[in-house]
Amino acid sequence: MWSFANDRFAARVYFCSNTAVPRQRNPIRPKILIFDVDGVLVDVRGTYWRSALETVRHLSGKRVTYAELHKWKSKPGNNDDWAMTAAWLTALGRPTTYDEARATFEKFYWGTDGKPGLVRNEKLLITPVQIQRWAKRYELNLFTGRTRQEFSFTFKRWAGTEYFRRVITMDDAKKKPDPEGLRMILDGRDPAAALYVGDNIDDALAARGARVPFAAIVAAGDAGYRQRMARFRELGALALLARARDLNQLLVK
């Protein structure tokens, strides 16, 4: 058994890519896998990220970039896109409330007046077959910053959904980085028996708060990815992975 505070594991960080993947001398043996959704199971670059950019551009009248978006996403407390866009707009000199940011964001995300929303651009990054394989070996759960409505829209027809024991959305628990959602999933069980896989600083902070080991998804080439890698190392990530399926390189077979 291993624990989050074990420096031997925390110092052993891997970045899996399309090239050679280093052999794991210390593979891990969790019993429970907990996944974030956005950036882990679902590609949200054309949906949530784009909606955030369009919201800031629309309300501020200024041209903003994905590089700026990543700087804001890397700040603790900004896993909530509505809170992030409100803070971003205010910093640009256009004071914006949470409710105004959310209302504008959702117009781009869901669409209005018969105009399709960006939500239709969402793409799943993991196949149901891979989820089924993991489900044969581990208990699977989800802890996401999505609302229940957003989660259901994307996952209601996905065959992999049935394999998750529990799904905790932002409607069910306090927002990340609060670890309440992870603790609800554990339900008194040993945190060291789990592994949380996420792509956001708030995911890592929630894992640390719940004393759950953490693996970070960091796609090479994304704006600011080197800075995010360094920050995840500081927070004790067991591994840095290019994509969720690289988790297979980390787990004991």
Regions found by a protein language model. Name each.
Residues 2-35, 87, 96-100, 252:
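Non-catalytic pre-domain segments flanking phosphatase-related domains
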Residues 41, 140, 196-197:
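Conserved SAM-binding loop
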